[in-house]
Amino acid sequence: MLVTYRYKLRLRSGQYARMAQLCEMQRQLYNAALEERIGAWSRARHSVTRLDQQKSLTEIRQADPEGHGSLPVNMGRWTLKRVEDAMTGFFSRVKRGQKAGFPRFKGRHRWSSFGMLEVSGMQLRGQFLILKGMDRAIRLNMHRPLPADAKIKGATFTLHGRHWFVSLQVESTEIVAAEAPTGPAIGLDVGVEHLATWSDGAVDGHIPNVRPRSRREHELRCAQRALARCRRGSRRRAKVRERLARLHRAIGNARDTHLHQQAERLARSHKLIVIERLQVRNMVRSAAGTVAEPGTNVRAKSGLNRSILDASMAKFLQYLRYKAERAGSAVLEVRAAGTSQLCSGCGTKVPKSLSVRRHSCACGLELQRDVNAARVILLRGLPAEGVQPLGQPNVADHGVRAAGTLLAA
């Protein structure tokens, strides 16, 4: 299994300048490679491939032994792969009819990382990382050890504010748990009031939404207003921008810590977790409309969009998937349509707006809205694990089977 371990670098005073120099060299290489592709196509309608540019990189390294020639060749190849990925993504978006977004040249403030596709030219010895091109070994803040059988497949160095971090791509068999969890299967409904609500049909629970951005909204607004008043290029603007960046990092760290902890707890406690197949990008679309057809309730929808993004539902489900794989449990996705409108007791559709927080059905079932949705999600996922039990309420929208026949999920 491939997993990424992220560590903070404890650099010496002279190593900060060298890391910045390496990052700048890779930025210039990226811009040169992109310019070569654009120029070759505009002049002769010739497509330059990644292999062509890797051959050119060999010539550059031979002509510049003190610069690119002193660095691991995989570092330059990592940068060329980023150019290839940018062009591939552009053509893919064009074919799908989406907004193309042609790759653009990277300025100093739009490039903050470099990496290596392979580990040749880099060694990890205890808490020290030996990197070709650095005069001294780099000390890592190893807050957690790597698995004993870990094989490093790649590395990415990233600058966040004033600090450098390294992300090591590791392959290991010790990461996956030997025994799967034995807890009951649950359905999981994510939302804004609670980050997630789960239910196994008998026991229910909530995961709180900590709302890290909302808690520091006043600080963010003050910093953004101060930045808007600064003159571009001034020292004061640089200081305010750094203050704003630190604030955003603190918010992101608080959010990620909460998401990691809650996803880990669920993955280690339940053998099956059934979730909705959400399209968060569609959920946070603007309601402003156009000049000809202006939208309605624009301010309310904008506030809801901020709350959805602050909760980071998609990131939480992403963490849950890979943590479940490590814990030996399973995550199953089901359709999200109608989960909050159907009754988990009888399968009847009970329409309700977002302001209605209680589910009340004519069959006599009364539940908190999110708990009912979690139970519907669970019932939709159980047939995929086997067959639909006879007499089970048809909340999963499957075809109704006759007695004595089997219905595949």
Predicted regions and their residues:
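Short, glycine- and charge-enriched coil/turn segments that flank and shape catalytic ligand pockets
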Residues: 41-53, 95, 178-181, 229-236
